[in-house]
Amino acid sequence: MNKKTIAMLGAGSWGTAVAIHLAKIGHKTLLWSHNPQHVALMAEQHSNPAYLPGIPFPENLIPSDDLIECVQSADYVIIAVPSHAFAEITNKIPKPTQGLAWLTKGVDPASHQLLSQLVASRFGVDFPIAVISGPSFAKEVARFLPTALTLASNNTNYQKKMHQLFHHDNIRVYLSDDLIGVQLCGAVKNILAIACGISDGLGYGANAKAALITRGLAEMTRLGLSMGARQDTFLGLAGVGDLVLTCTDDQSRNRRFGLLLGREVPIPEAEHQIGQVVEGKHNAAQICAIANKNKVEMPICEQINALLHGIVHAQEAVNNLMSRPAKEE
């Protein structure tokens, strides 16, 4: 593929890491942040000390705080803001010429919609979109360590272009047309990572964590199937791959947040210690609302949501799960 200009909207750790990857393989990459001071610091230090310290920017990675200019200058636009800011960004930007891709994992907190539904209401149901997900920590992608991702799209031509844009020796990209499944995996796995962190924070050991991962996978699969997703998606990179990674490795901010809660650190202090958005905290209520609407039982997610809203404490949430009536697996 000829080298392109990419607008990466969102300069957190994940958006920055993917921007570094795209710039390293030759694409001019515009890294947008809403904060002019953050942009000035990145431009001065040629890195992102706030969210991805110690990894220098390639020369063709350019920080910017001009949202409209970034979009209008780019061949391809990728959104990497937290889910609660996604609607605001899509409402502000002009319609991208090629389509719109995003790295964001979550659902819209105001409407409980999938992000693809928000984009369809803004730019039309036939507008090309792509969701990029899978087991991937920012530092490892930025350091060119081997990574495999899933790229789901509603448009095969746009999907092919995005595949060519991302695919490289260190990143293998698998294709999917299951937008619903890939998006749900990305949202639910963060809630389950909080649960696994809490379990480890309470000192419950490997058996409990394995049970949470396995039963959590069953929960997210049930929800996905009720909404038209495909079961194989949940057994792939975006599903079990990302779930296992996020639940077991302390690079996961959702898992670290859960660890703190399991050690009885108050929620505001735990968020402060993490220092970045904890998507699982923001998405728990939304996922439970979607599950309730679709009449799907998600007991692990429900207990985490109750804990986050002060209804139960960590030990009580575990007791509630363990005392549920016996049932077939």
UniProtKB/Swiss-Prot annotation:
It is found in: Cytoplasm. The keyword DNA damage does not apply. Keywords: Cytoplasm, Lipid biosynthesis, Lipid metabolism, NAD, NADP, Nucleotide-binding, Oxidoreductase, Phospholipid biosynthesis, Phospholipid metabolism. Gene3D superfamilies: N-(1-d-carboxylethyl)-l-norvaline Dehydrogenase, domain 2 (1.10.1040.10), NAD(P)-binding Rossmann-like Domain (3.40.50.720). One of its GO terms (biological process) is glycerophospholipid biosynthetic process. GO terms for cellular component: cytosol. InterPro entries: 6-PGluconate_DH-like_C_sf (IPR008927), 6PGD_dom2 (IPR013328), G3P_DH_NAD-dep (IPR006168), G3P_DH_NAD-dep_C (IPR006109), G3P_DH_NAD-dep_N (IPR011128), NAD(P)-bd_dom_sf (IPR036291). It comes from the Bacteria. The active site is at 189 (proton acceptor). This is Glycerol-3-phosphate dehydrogenase [NAD(P)+].
